């Protein structure tokens, strides 16, 4: 399926100079959303995944249906102050600013094979931070899946040594 026809291009959002790739049209089309989810599920099945991890918020949109289809758990990575129990944290930079990500300390058991999911790979800051959280808890990053990669931002360089699936590139 050509997923690009289901991704809206929004110039100057959230800041001037940013060209945002909006996946909500893909989510609004049940067949496209299912096809994207199925592609990631097939990728994950080849990697013997124990747990799916996704950063807030669009990583949830991708990761939850994948974890459901695989019959494995989902662990959210959230911004500081959004998780109610003891967390570990990491500071990170992203395409349009800086932030802190967290995950519950008990979210991942040592040795669990983890699939990280997110909507978009831009500079790689969010995923690099998510990888650090997973690995600090003893998880093994068995795969990383994105709907979209912005190749001109060169975020892939942050993922050397990791197995990556991208459904569409810009």
From Swiss-Prot:
Main location: cytoplasm
One GO MF term: adenine phosphoribosyltransferase activity
A GO cellular component annotation in the UniProt record: cytoplasm
Enzyme's top EC category: transferase
Gene3D superfamilies: 3.40.50.2020
Highest taxon of the lineage: Bacteria
Biological or metabolic pathway of the protein: Purine metabolism; AMP biosynthesis via salvage pathway; AMP from adenine: step 1/1
Matching InterPro entries: Ade_phspho_trans, PRibTrfase_dom, PRTase-like, UPRTase/APRTase
Catalytic activity annotation: AMP + diphosphate = 5-phospho-alpha-D-ribose 1-diphosphate + adenine
Signal peptide: none
A Pfam family matched in the record: Pribosyltran
EC number: 2.4.2.7
Keyword terms, alphabetized: Cytoplasm, Glycosyltransferase, Purine salvage, Transferase
Subcellular locations according to the entry: Cytoplasm
Any one GO biological process: AMP salvage
Keyword Cytoplasm: yes
PANTHER family for this protein: ADENINE PHOSPHORIBOSYLTRANSFERASE
Quaternary structure annotation from Swiss-Prot or TrEMBL: Homodimer.
Summary of the function given for this chain in its UniProt record: Catalyzes a salvage reaction resulting in the formation of AMP, that is energically less costly than de novo synthesis.
Protein family membership: Belongs to the purine/pyrimidine phosphoribosyltransferase family.
Name the UniProt record assigns to this protein: Adenine phosphoribosyltransferase
Organism this protein belongs to: Bacillus anthracis
């Amino acid at each position: 399926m050509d997923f690009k026809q289901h991704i809206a291009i929004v110039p100057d959002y959230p800041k001037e100079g940013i060209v945002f790739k909006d996946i909500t049209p893909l989510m609004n089309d049940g067949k496209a959303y299912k096809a994207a989810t199925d592609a990631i599920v097939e990728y994950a099945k080849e990697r013997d995944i124990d747990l799916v991890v996704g950063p807030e918020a669009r990583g949830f949109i991708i990761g939850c249906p994948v974890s459901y289809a695989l019959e494995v758990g989902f662990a959210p990575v959230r911004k500081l102050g959004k998780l109610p129990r003891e967390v570990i944290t990491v500071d990170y930079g992203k395409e349009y600013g800086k932030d802190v990500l967290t995950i519950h300390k008990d979210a991942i058991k040592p040795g669990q094979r983890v699939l990280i999911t997110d909507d978009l790979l831009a500079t790689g800051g969010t995923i690099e931070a998510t990888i650090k959280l997973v690995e600090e808890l003893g998880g093994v990053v068995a795969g990383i899946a994105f709907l979209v990669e912005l190749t001109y931002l060169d975020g892939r360089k942050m993922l050397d040594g990791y197995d990556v699936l991208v459904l569409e590139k810009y």
